[in-house]
Design a protein with these regions (language model features):
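Conserved histidines in hydrophobic membrane contexts and catalytic metal-binding motifs
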Residues: 1-170
Length: 170
């Protein structure tokens, strides 16, 4: 005769094997993605940082004017200037129609010169897409990863229930 705990154990095992394999993939891709800034900084030393100068850094409005004077016609949506000396500024352009995010470029905060594009950025965009949406279109992958997160929560709770001793220690 099957008891409730035996049936629950079988369900726990089945869901754990099924969802667990995909959850491992999500976890590993998340671990890789968590280091994307450090790896990109290491791969692109001339893009993420600039040589320190005695001159003052440009103000955000002067930086935007310098970038647009270099021939850039797209609308600048956001400028990120770091307080850390020698760190390049980031400019995010407005998203094109049909895109969720605009392109990000780096600029020298002293001159406004646009710096070369980062190498390795496409790889980390792929890793992020794997982690968040399992390389599926966003509207298809988001409910799947949400369901897997719910399965992880249920597996954790059912694992506690299954592991809990039948008789407490006296």
């Amino acid at each position: 005769m099957w008891s409730f705990k035996k049936i629950w154990f079988q369900l726990h095992w089945l869901i754990g094997i099924s969802a667990g394999t995909v959850l491992v993939l999500i976890g590993l891709s998340g671990a890789v993605f968590s280091f994307h800034e450090e790896v990109l900084d290491w791969l692109n030393p001339g893009t993420s940082s600039v040589t320190l100068r005695d001159a003052p850094e440009l103000s955000p409005s002067a930086l935007a004017q310098a970038v647009q004077a270099s021939g850039e016609t797209r609308r600048i949506d956001r400028i990120t200037v770091y307080s850390e000396p020698g760190k390049s500024a980031q400019l995010t352009f407005a998203a094109e129609p049909g895109q969720r995010r605009g392109e990000v470029v780096f600029a020298d905060p002293y001159t406004g010169k646009v710096l070369p594009e980062q190498k390795g950025k496409d790889f980390f965009e792929w890793v992020e897409s794997l982690h968040r949406w399992l390389l599926l279109p966003r509207d298809d992958g988001k409910p799947i990863t949400g369901t897997l997160a719910f399965c992880l929560l249920m597996l954790s709770l059912s694992g506690l229930y299954l592991r809990w001793p039948a008789k407490p220690l006296s």
